[in-house]
Amino acid sequence: MSSIHVAVLLTVYNRKKQTLRCLSDLYKQTLPDNTNFEVFLTDDGCTDGTAEAIHKEFPNVHIIQGNGTLFWNRGMWTAWNAASKAREFEYYLWLNDDTFTYPTMIKELLN
């Protein structure tokens, strides 16, 4: 059976607490066998230490730096663009940084 690769995309701006909670929930996922995910996060010019906190707590997150002019839509496109250049993913999951997920969310979405 081949692996299923999921790219999780987020855009953040000065919402460190919410973003860390979202990522914490995300990394507690119970995934189906042969399934993995990578997180691609656009930091659109955060000034509250969001990127630094993410890098410290979740070093595997791909952080793409914005300059504060991307806003959510362009930030999500930027994250998707980085993910699509990194590898071929079967699925792309767009999340808001204040999304709190259940441990079986990805598994249920794939079913």
Predicted regions and their residues:
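A conserved hydrophobic helix/loop-capping motif in glycosyltransferases and polysaccharide synthases
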Residues: 6-18, 22, 29, 42
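A conserved acidic beta->alpha catalytic loop
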Residues: 25, 43-52
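Short, acidic, metal-binding catalytic loop of nucleotide-sugar glycosyltransferases
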Residues: 25-35
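A short, amphipathic alpha-helix embedded in the catalytic core of nucleotide-handling enzymes
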Residues: 26, 54, 79, 105-111
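Short beta-strand/loop segment that forms part of the nucleotide-sugar
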Residues: 35-45, 64-66
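Acidic donor-binding/catalytic loop of UDP-sugar-dependent glycosyltransferases
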Residues: 49, 74, 98-111
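Glycine-rich, basic loop-to-helix element that forms the pyrophosphate-binding segment
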Residues: 66-87
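Short beta-strand-to-loop acidic/aromatic patch adjacent to the donor-nucleotide binding site
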Residues: 88-98
